[in-house]
Design a protein with these regions (language model features):
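Short glycine/proline-enriched loop/turn "hinge" motifs that connect secondary-structure elements
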Residues: 91-92, 206-210, 317-324
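A long, amphipathic alpha-helix that forms part
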Residues: 70-99, 109, 115-161, 166, ...
Length: 373
């Protein structure tokens, strides 16, 4: 048993009907959706049927050309409004030690609508810009209005933390890191595929590959199932070689360097980094990863850098320097004074701050510090 929404897109000669992804029913789910298990049903009593699994907006539908932007925004804002109403309903029911609400509103708006407000974007269309150029501003204003409603209901005796895990930047150019690695002989495709398709890798001959959002793993013998790079000095030499080559990479159309910094994995991540990336490059602002290579494949027959004509016109994944995609952190409540939050607050400071407000000590292994110390 599942739930979904339908929208009649057109009813002319050809009937066009949009259906959202089918979701598990929150009151009779196939598997537990919450802890305690009955909590998902309680939320349904507050707001009715709601999206229960995955991203509560059809970003992928827009990306694949299945969903138009008007339909996307109607469905997305309906979902986000339900989330706010859930929070308001829960606040009215009882006093909570901690209540967390996560809204994707501004994130989604920056991904899909950046090009409509930015004349420098290669996908900018002045005619469509009239309809969509204020969508990012609309997202900020909507979130601000909902925050006002929440604060009004919470009262003055509660501390409120507003935090984003990133900011946003335009994506003018798309780069294909695995194709770049292949061009340098560091990566070898296993198969021949048509241009524009993603090929799997020949791991016996591949020395390095990009996974996820831009991090690079070396195919180290003894660590990877079919490792081809000897640990020790050969491994370090290859890391240095690839890092130097990345920093020397230039966009032939603009002359700009594509990568502005390359760090070793242990410089970025603390704790147990044995399975982490070996290199973490940071792209120049305005560049972003092309799709299709994130699962360790390589795009065939495509330039290493292309103009971004995709619906994904803004982003934060990069990978970028933190200073290029800085987020927002705001504290409000009893005992919080202007200037209490340091100018260089980090995302890893949020958990220690929350623990401090709850009267709990942060574990010794946790990164970051309380912003109220």
């Amino acid at each position: 048993e599942g739930i979904c929404r339908f929208k009649l897109v057109s009813s002319g000669t050809v009937l066009s009907l949009y259906r959202t992804a089918v979701q598990c029913t929150p009151d009779r789910p196939l598997y537990p959706l919450s802890e305690p298990p009955g909590f998902s049903a309680r939320l349904a009593e507050l707001v009715g049927p709601y999206a229960t699994v995955g991203m509560p907006s059809d970003m992928d539908g827009v990306r694949r050309g299945i969903v138009d932007l008007d339909t996307f925004t109607q469905d997305a804002y309906a979902n986000w409004q339900q989330q706010v109403e859930m929070a308001l309903g829960l606040i009215a029911e009882r006093t909570w030690d901690l209540l967390f609400l996560h809204l994707f509103t501004i994130d989604n708006a920056q991904h899909l609508f950046w090009k409509y407000q930015d004349p420098l974007h290669p996908g900018y269309d002045a005619s469509l810009g009239v309809a969509y150029r204020t969508e990012i501003e609309r997202a900020y204003r909507w979130v601000d209005a909902q925050l006002g409603r929440l604060i009004e209901q919470i009262g003055d005796d509660t501390t409120v933390i507003v935090v984003s895990d990133h900011g946003g930047v335009p994506i003018y150019r798309l780069v294909y890191l695995n194709a770049w690695l292949a061009s340098g002989g560091y990566l070898v495709p296993r198969e021949h595929v048509r241009a524009g398709q993603a090929a799997r890798l020949d791991w016996d001959r591949t020395r390095a590959a990009m996974y996820g959002t831009g991090s690079i793993w070396l195919n180290v013998r003894g660590r990877e199932p079919r490792g081809s790079v000897e640990p020790g000095a050969p491994y370090e030499a290859l890391r240095d070689e690839i890092a130097r080559a990345l920093l020397a990479w230039r966009d032939p159309e603009t002359g700009e360097s594509v990568v502005v910094q390359v760090l070793r994995g242990e410089q970025v991540y603390g704790g147990n980094t044995g399975g982490g990336p070996d290199l973490v490059p940071a792209l120049r602002r305005g560049y972003g990863l092309g799709r299709g290579e994130g699962l360790g494949r390589v795009m065939a027959g495509r330039p290493l850098i292309v103009s971004n004509q995709s619906p994904w016109s803004g982003g934060h994944e990069g990978p970028y320097l933190p200073s290029d995609v800085g987020g927002v952190v705001v504290l409000w409540g009893p005992g919080v004074q202007e200037g209490d939050v340091p100018a260089r607050a980090a995302l890893c400071d949020i958990a220690p701050t929350v623990l401090s407000l709850l009267g709990m000590s942060a574990p010794g292994v946790i990164e970051g510090r309380s912003l109220l110390d």
